[in-house]
Amino acid sequence: MDDNNQATTLSNDPAVNAPDTATLGRDKGKATQDPAPTDTSMDEGESDESENEDIVKEDEDGGDDLAPIDSSNIISGRRTRGKTIDFVDAAQKLKDDEGEDDEDDEDFEP
């Protein structure tokens, strides 16, 4: 029975603790160096900024082409679909409905 426990004990032998070769090439690995280093001098940065300013100016000028809204295109009163509403009668119905709710509250026991 002692022979079965040998496989689970920790060992300092590099052959036993070798990393799995199947996972070596996945996701993470040693970083590689770029073959051509890029030069980031101040002269290049300044030219990039001027190009960005030109783009921003073009965007600001493009917003002035909006025409005002024509009031004849606005449709009003479509929610009622042509029905005339008597607001006095509707308010009276709401008051009547509120009274029915109060009666239901009296029967409620917490």
From Swiss-Prot:
- What highest taxon heads this organism's lineage? Eukaryota
Give the Acidic residues compositional bias ranges. 41-64, 97-110
Region (Disordered) location: 1-110
Xref: InterPro entries: Histone_chaperone_domain_CHZ
- Function description: Forms a chaperone-bound H2A.Z-H2B complex that acts as a source for SWR1 complex-dependent H2A to H2A.Z histone replacement in chromatin.
Subunit (UniProt) = Forms a heterotrimer with H2A.Z-H2B, stabilizing the association of the histone dimer. Also, with a lower affinity, forms a heterotrimer with H2A-H2B.
What's the protein name? Answer: Histone H2A.Z-specific chaperone chz1
Encoding gene (name)? chz1
